[in-house]
């Protein structure tokens, strides 16, 4: 099917169209707290939401930059998927085989693609439209921080999706033209560690609980309890779908949860400082001497570990496959183009027992 504005543009349009209906549903018990579209520009000015918008625009450009450098760096850092295969084996394959169903595949694929983008966008928007600037701050900071923390793992610890490594595992997420084109254009397909579908949702839930504890109330009495349940329900679906669709390893959940713990604690602590900057000035956001020294020390330590232990390290062992499939399997992978002036060079080395046939397809000619 020919999508006039492409799969990504179509998804963004659906995201915008769903914002108000879902917000109205979740706030049906307190319509008086809603911000109308006519009043939204004034609400943005009065509550100082300009930096939220700027932050999301910055993250859009930053992600494009990271994805652009992901593939070229793999020549020096390789991949570590074989470590996870040695630990987990074919557990996710058994999950897929036990539940595989065409209707379930369609539902979970649509949910996986759309709902993650929707939660990224909707979380701060929900609180803005509900007149809760503190939680709007926390939701925006949550996405910013958890993605920033994940980037080093995405760039230096490449782990392929399970459908690219477990023989017999079907890439159910990429089963139709829409989702295939969406992920080829927007997903390097080797950013399994950590799972931000899990991490982002879990950190939002943790932030909610830190917030109500500070307020001295029960989560069940919180005015945003239905939104909390909405996030919780989506997290439950993700825990199953990331395995069923042939995307994440079970172990990917652990780093996602670890990122969530760090992100939630930091965001909860720093949000009052960020909110008070309007009275205290931008200088109040700068770290003190102790915090600066600690940050530099951690950055140097992590950078040294990456340069010594990862670059040209265990991940570039040519005898370890970074892509596997069984005899008779047909597997789709994407070759990313990063320059209009330089060709893409791809080397295929068969380290298995059976012959391999490779066919290159230009999507523009299909």
Segments from the language model and where they lie:
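Terminal transmembrane helix and immediately flanking juxtamembrane interfaces
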Residues: 1-157, 177-182, 212-244, 250, ...
């Amino acid at each position: 099917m020919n999508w006039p504005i492409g799969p990504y543009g179509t998804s963004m349009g659906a995201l915008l169209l769903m914002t108000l209906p879902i917000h109205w549903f979740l706030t049906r018990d307190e319509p008086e707290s809603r911000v109308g579209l006519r009043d939204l520009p004034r609400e943005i000015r009065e509550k100082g939401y300009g930096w939220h918008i700027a932050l999301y625009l910055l993250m859009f450009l930053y992600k494009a930059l990271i994805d652009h450098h992901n593939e070229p760096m793999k020549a020096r850092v390789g991949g570590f998927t074989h470590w996870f295969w040695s630990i987990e084996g074919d557990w996710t394959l058994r999950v897929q085989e036990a539940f595989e169903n065409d209707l379930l595949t369609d539902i979970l694929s649509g949910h996986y693609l759309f709902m993650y983008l929707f939660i990224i966008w909707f979380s701060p928007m929900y609180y803005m439209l509900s007149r809760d600037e503190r939680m709007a701050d926390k939701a925006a900071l949550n996405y910013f921080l958890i993605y920033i923390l994940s980037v080093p793992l995405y760039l230096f610890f490449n782990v392929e999706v399970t459908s690219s490594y477990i023989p017999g595992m079907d890439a159910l997420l990429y089963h139709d033209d829409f989702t295939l084109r969406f992920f080829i254009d927007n997903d390097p397909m080797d950013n399994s560690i950590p799972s931000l579908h899990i991490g982002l949702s879990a950190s939002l839930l943790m932030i909610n609980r830190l917030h109500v504890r500070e307020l001295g109330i029960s989560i069940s009495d919180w005015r945003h309890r239905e939104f909390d349940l909405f996030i919780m329900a989506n997290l439950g679906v993700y825990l199953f779908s990331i395995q069923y669709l042939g995307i994440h390893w079970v172990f990917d959940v652990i780093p996602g949860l670890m990122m969530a713990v760090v992100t939630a604690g930091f965001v909860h602590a720093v949000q009052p400082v960020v909110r008070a900057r309007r009275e205290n000035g931008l200088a109040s956001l700068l770290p003190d001497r102790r915090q600066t020294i600690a940050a530099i020390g951690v950055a140097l330590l992590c950078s040294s570990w990456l340069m010594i232990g990862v670059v040209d390290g265990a991940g570039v062992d040519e005898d370890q496959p970074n892509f596997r499939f069984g005899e008779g399997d047909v597997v789709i992978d994407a070759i990313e183009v990063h320059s209009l002036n330089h060709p893409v060079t791809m080397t295929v080395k068969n380290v298995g027992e059976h012959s391999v046939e490779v066919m290159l397809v230009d999507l523009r000619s299909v």
